[in-house]
From Swiss-Prot:
Reactions listed under catalytic activity: carbamoyl phosphate + L-aspartate = N-carbamoyl-L-aspartate + phosphate + H(+)
UniProt protein name: Aspartate carbamoyltransferase catalytic subunit
GO biological process: 'de novo' pyrimidine nucleobase biosynthetic process; 'de novo' UMP biosynthetic process; amino acid metabolic process
Gene this chain is encoded by: pyrB
Organism: Prochlorococcus marinus (strain MIT 9312)
Residues annotated for carbamoyl phosphate binding in this entry: 60-61, 110, 143, 146, 295-296
């Protein structure tokens, strides 16, 4: 693991180097080993304050981050938008500055505005605040911790002996659904491609525009060059059946029902018929490939209950479990930067 963590803030995986990924995965694995040996809490962040600023509803991410902080012995401060000064007109940035002034070492932020964590970090840095910002999902832009835990889940599945992200090289990873409106998918594209995975995006053109073929050519803000020298590929398919036949793993995205209101789909039923994951469609692949879903699940729409509950390599609960050591690693590494 690298001796110096290079990021004060974590906004996106677009600026992660191979070594950055490996540092996170190696540390997460160490936390996994400790937990499996019966050590559920360690004093690594004792005396530090992690503040959870969630401006959007969340079950998995919010609770996972708070549990991760507690397992590192950090103090956890939870923000409730409905009872905050936001109701009096205070801006999001001023709210973040207030919590920083209270002594927050890390602000874990989720918000509906893309790139908002960049703006908050910029304000904090301008006043020389030591507070780090960790993006827990911003608009359609990015969800770094979800991308990392998804990749970690696949690495654990494919690694036969020692844990190695290199097992993803040349693997065909199928992502099904509403990529265009998914911050999770964007983070997965950066992370999977970094380790040479070949990504197949499958869905209707209204949810996966042809322009996504060039997604990896778009740098992060203020990023001059890609820190990963060679990436895997992106292809787009409109046929789920043909894509499943060649896939080594599948990531299913939640269909946001509001897309019907935007006239992006003719009907939920037709989408489910064409792109819903069923046992019958999975049988087109000769292997029992791993199935991931970031949650929450729309049972019977993008994936059937039979797949979720009975398919042997449905790893949805594994993803939830893996989120804790991954987020422990991120919180720990940010404090390492500040020290």
């Amino acid at each position: 693991m690298q001796t110096i963590w290079p990021h004060k803030h974590i906004h996106t995986l677009a600026n992660f180097s191979i070594q950055d990924y490996k540092s996170v995965f190696e540390l997460a694995h160490r936390f996994d080993v400790l937990k499996n040996a019966g050590t559920k809490k360690i004093p690594a962040l004792q005396g530090t304050l992690v503040t959870s600023l969630f401006f959007e509803a969340s079950t998995r991410t919010k609770n996972s981050f708070e549990l991760a902080a507690k397992r590192l012995s950090a103090d956890v401060q939870t923000f409730a938008p409905s009872s905050s000064s936001l109701t009096k007109g205070e801006t999001i940035i001023d709210t973040a500055l207030t919590y920083s002034a209270m002594g927050a070492d890390t602000l874990v932020i989720r918000h509906s505005s893309s790139y908002i964590t960049f703006e908050i970090a910029k304000k904090l840095d301008a006043i020389n605040a030591k507070t780090s910002v960790l993006n827990a999902g911003d608009g359609l832009h990015s969800h770094p911790s979800q991308g990392l835990l998804d990749i970690y889940t696949l690495i654990k599945f494919f690694s036969k002996k020692s844990l190695s992200p290199d097992v993803l090289n040349s693997k065909k990873i199928l992502i099904i659904g509403d990529v265009n409106h998914s911050r999770v998918a964007r983070s997965n594209l950066w992370a999977l491609s970094a380790f040479g995975a070949d990504i197949i995006l499958c869905g209707p053109k209204t949810l996966i525009p042809d322009e996504f073929i060039n997604f990896l050519k778009t740098p992060a803000p203020k990023q001059k060059e890609d820190p990963v020298k060679s990436r895997g590929s992106i292809t787009i398919s409109r046929s789920l059946e043909e894509s499943i036949k060649i896939a080594d793993a599948i990531i299913v995205l939640r269909l946001q029902k509001e897309r019907m209101m935007e006239n992006l789909l003719s009907s939920i039923d037709s989408y489910s018929l064409d792109y819903g994951l069923t046992p019958e469609k999975l049988s087109l692949n000769s292997k029992e490939i791993p199935i991931l879903h970031p949650g929450p699940i729309n049972r019977g729409i993008e994936i059937t209950s039979k797949v979720v509950d009975e398919y042997p390599n449905c790893l949805i609960n594994n993803q939830v479990a893996n989120g804790i050591p991954i987020r422990m690693a991120l919180l720990y590494l940010l404090q390492k930067y500040n020290k």
